[in-house]
């Protein structure tokens, strides 16, 4: 039975088999849900790479009674992704032998993340989802939901992501993985009985954060300013004499290292590298055109990580485009998490459109 009190709930889903042929035993998926569940009013939110199931914390002001995602009308559910570290089975979780999975944890794809979530819903008796909404990695999962299990969802909203990982994205994401693997405490992923690779994950976050924010925003905030009380222009290089932007990025890295597991970061980043909606489906455009679920697309005009042209590509090729929206912001990729006024307006528009969708018409399209 679905728990809708907003508390973190841990649900065992049994063994899980990845699409590449690996087995995870006795998997747990954690989730949180808010609002009264009627069986037909479920909205599923898909979090980004280092997010979690507590959607109210990362979309504060958008979820609740009378808000864009109205808990008086809908039940809002968000899982912690398989491979994560916030309650779901991941590299830090116990293997059947009692030790952490560590290096034995298998590689995952975006499709695996979706299928694990589907397995959770099967255990909870959920067979109808009004809408699935996700940004960044959550957007990739939303897109795969529409390709893998269209019969379960009425509509979807895909935000700030592409149809597949680009070579640039794979390159920048692999650099982050390398930063973690080069930390001497990484130990091939088997570090849970000792010192965690905090320096590695902090460095990975510094790289990633520059892709999450806009170049204009970063430059306007920091420019070439020195960190208060420091001088980066001295006669000799000193890592303790920093530019302000360096201090800011180091702070972002430390914050993530304190709350997120490096093993999960590697597994989920690799899953993003494997993202390709066209794999095994005749290529990108054929796969997109075969999606009959009505999908709304949104992107950020200054996004470096998933440039807006990638959302335009989705909009041109999806088999059933519901609508398109642009988030205008100097912030860059993270704007879908920070531009709350724009996101509220866009989400309300999406919900209005979703309520007007004729399920019987979509069923005819699928035949």
From Swiss-Prot:
Localization, UniProt: Cytoplasm
SUPFAM superfamilies recorded: alpha/beta-Hydrolases (SSF53474)
Keywords assigned: Acyltransferase, Amino-acid biosynthesis, Cytoplasm, Methionine biosynthesis, Transferase
Highest taxon of the lineage: Bacteria
Reactions that this protein is recorded to catalyse: L-homoserine + acetyl-CoA = O-acetyl-L-homoserine + CoA
Predominant location: cytoplasm
One Pfam family from the record: Abhydrolase_1
First-tier enzyme category under EC: transferase
EC number(s) from the headed UniProt entry: 2.3.1.31
Pathway it works in: Amino-acid biosynthesis; L-methionine biosynthesis via de novo pathway; O-acetyl-L-homoserine from L-homoserine: step 1/1
GO biological process: homoserine metabolic process; methionine biosynthetic process
Transmembrane domains' residue ranges: none
Domain AB hydrolase-1 positions: 41-339
Family, as annotated: Belongs to the AB hydrolase superfamily. MetX family.
Role summary: Transfers an acetyl group from acetyl-CoA to L-homoserine, forming acetyl-L-homoserine.
Protein name per Swiss-Prot or TrEMBL: Homoserine O-acetyltransferase
Gene source species: Corynebacterium diphtheriae (strain ATCC 700971 / NCTC 13129 / Biotype gravis)
Gene from which the chain derives: metXA
């Amino acid at each position: 039975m679905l728990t809708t009190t907003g508390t973190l709930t841990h649900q065992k889903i049994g063994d899980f088999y990845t699409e590449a042929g690996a087995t995870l035993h006795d998997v747990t998926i954690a989730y949180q849900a808010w609002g009264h569940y009627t069986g037909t009013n479920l909205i599923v939110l898909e979090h980004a790479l280092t997010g979690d199931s507590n959607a109210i914390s990362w979309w504060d002001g958008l979820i609740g009674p009378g808000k864009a995602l109205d808990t008086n009308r809908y039940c809002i559910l968000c899982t912690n992704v398989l491979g994560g570290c916030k309650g779901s089975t991941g590299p830090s979780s116990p293997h059947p032998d009692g030790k952490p999975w560590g290096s034995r944890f298998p590689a995952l794809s975006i499709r695996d993340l979706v299928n694990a979530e589907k397995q959770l819903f099967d255990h909870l008796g959920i067979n109808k989802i009004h809408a699935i909404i996700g940004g960044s990695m959550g957007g990739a999962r939303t897109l795969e939901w529409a390709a893998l299990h269209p019969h379960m969802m009425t509509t979807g909203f895909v935000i700030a992501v592409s149809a597949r990982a680009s070579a640039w994205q794979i390159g920048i994401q692999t650099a982050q993985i390398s930063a973690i693997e080069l930390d001497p405490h990484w130990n091939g992923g088997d570090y849970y009985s000792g010192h965690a690779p905090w320096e590695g994950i902090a460095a990975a976050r510094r790289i990633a954060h520059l892709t999450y924010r806009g170049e204009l925003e970063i430059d306007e905030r920091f420019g070439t300013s020195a960190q208060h009380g420091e001088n980066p222009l001295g006669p000799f290089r000193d890592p303790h004499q920093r530019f302000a932007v360096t201090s800011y990025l180091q702070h972002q890295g430390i914050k993530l290292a304190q709350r997120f597991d490096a093993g999960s970061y590697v597994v989920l980043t690799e899953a993003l590298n494997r993202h390709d909606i066209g794999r095994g489906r005749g290529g990108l455009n054929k796969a997109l055109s075969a999606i009959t679920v009505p999908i709304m697309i949104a992107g950020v005009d200054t996004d470096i990580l998933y440039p807006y042209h990638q959302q335009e590509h989705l909009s041109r090729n999806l088999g059933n485009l519901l609508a398109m929206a642009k988030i205008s912001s100097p912030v860059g990729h993270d704007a879908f998490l920070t531009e709350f006024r724009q996101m509220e307006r866009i989400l309300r528009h999406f919900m209005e459109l979703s309520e007007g969708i004729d399920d019987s018409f979509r069923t005819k399209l699928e035949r």
